[in-house]
Amino acid sequence: MKKGLLILLTFHFSLLVSLAQQGDAQIRQKISQAAAAMKTMQCDFVQTKHLKMLSEEMVSKGRMCYQQSQCLRWEYTSPYDYTLIINHDKVLLKNRQRQDVIDVNQNRFFKEIASIMMNSVVGNCLNDDKSFKSTVTARGGEWVATLTPQRRDMKQMFREIILHFSQREAMVTQVELIEKNGDRTTIELKNVKTNETISPDMFTVR
């Protein structure tokens, strides 16, 4: 009797695991298909920084533009003006006082940051098995992907990266960056437009 019950429970558990793995694979496939179909993306964003040492949150706002083939413009407009542009292997950092151009191939830190930003906005981090261990779950009307860094340099920066996807569009709606010390940055994407023409000037690095 006990042996039969154990066999039944084992079978039931195996079935649940199998169904979960199938669901996970289907979600990943839908996200990958949506990312591949997204040639451009434009949106507003609200970034909220939660610091363990402070009770007040730091909120900033801005505009993001993405173009498939490694181009990203991340522009803060409030409470300060600051722009980061990624164009393949070049990064431009610009504010009102100065601007700097960085070759990411010669700066490992910026290469990692550029990779995380570029891949997070469309969900491609899910396909980077060498950099992240990831799990995907359905929660309400969204999919939530939790990414745990695997490489040593990534572990020094982040404990987890959590991506929230709309189930309807299979697109990222929110990114959470949990740092090693427990500080958390939440980025919410709003007014998203996809596959509309973006001027090449938006990604100029010089």
Stretch-by-stretch model annotation:
Residues 18-20, 25:
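Boundary at the C-terminal end of the N-terminal hydrophobic targeting segment
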Residues 38-40, 59-61, 69, 79, ...:
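Extracytoplasmic
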Residues 7-15:
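Bacterial N-terminal signal peptides
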Residues 102, 125-206:
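Gly/Pro-enriched, hydrophobic low-complexity segments
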Residues 45, 72-76, 91-94, 145-147, ...:
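Short hydrophobic/aromatic-rich beta-strand segments that constitute the beta-sheet cores
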Residues 26-27, 32-44, 49, 55-57, ...:
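Flexible, processing/modification-adjacent segments and terminal tails
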Residues 1-4:
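Positively charged n-region of N-terminal signal peptides that target proteins for export
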Residues 63-115, 185, 191:
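An acidic-aromatic
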